[in-house]
A protein has these predicted regions:
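ATP-dependent carboxylate-amine ligase
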Residues: 1-134
Length: 134
């Protein structure tokens, strides 16, 4: 899900599973929804350890000036609900960040709408390459 209530439900289900940390990659859905729900995102990720926010999946919608994934990450940063929050619009930079951030024992969740579903497989491929080259 990509609505703040759905996100909060996923986070509350994941937290008691016993992982060292919960790392979430989130892709907001549509510029209008991101703008309308911006304040609701501030507490949607409560309790997780790491949040990486991608750019908005437009679903064919035209961009709204000043609305991006940064809109979400900024709300979470201001609310101080997640210790490590970053807005990373570049897929390449995001995968590089995850390779440095995700540790054994962590749970990585990809959530949202759009091509965020590709991030898990991309991360696994990059991790395998890193392990083969070391």
């Amino acid at each position: 899900g990509h609505h703040p209530t759905e996100i909060a439900a996923t986070m509350s289900a994941a937290l008691p599973l016993g992982f060292k940390r919960v790392v979430v990659v989130f892709q907001p859905h549509r510029y209008s929804r991101t703008q309308d729900l911006a304040d609701s995102f501030a507490h949607a990720f409560d309790g997780i350890d790491v949040l990486r926010v991608m750019d908005v999946f437009s679903a064919g919608e035209l961009p709204i000036p000043g609305v991006s994934g940064k809109t979400v990450s900024s709300r979470v940063e201001v609310a101080h609900t997640v210790p490590d929050v970053r807005y990373i619009p570049s897929r390449r930079d995001l995968i590089a960040d995850l390779l440095d951030t995700v540790k054994p024992g962590d749970l990585l969740i990809t959530q949202g709408a759009g091509d965020v579903t590709q991030i898990g497989p991309m991360f696994i491929r990059a991790l395998k390459e890193r392990l083969q080259n070391h």
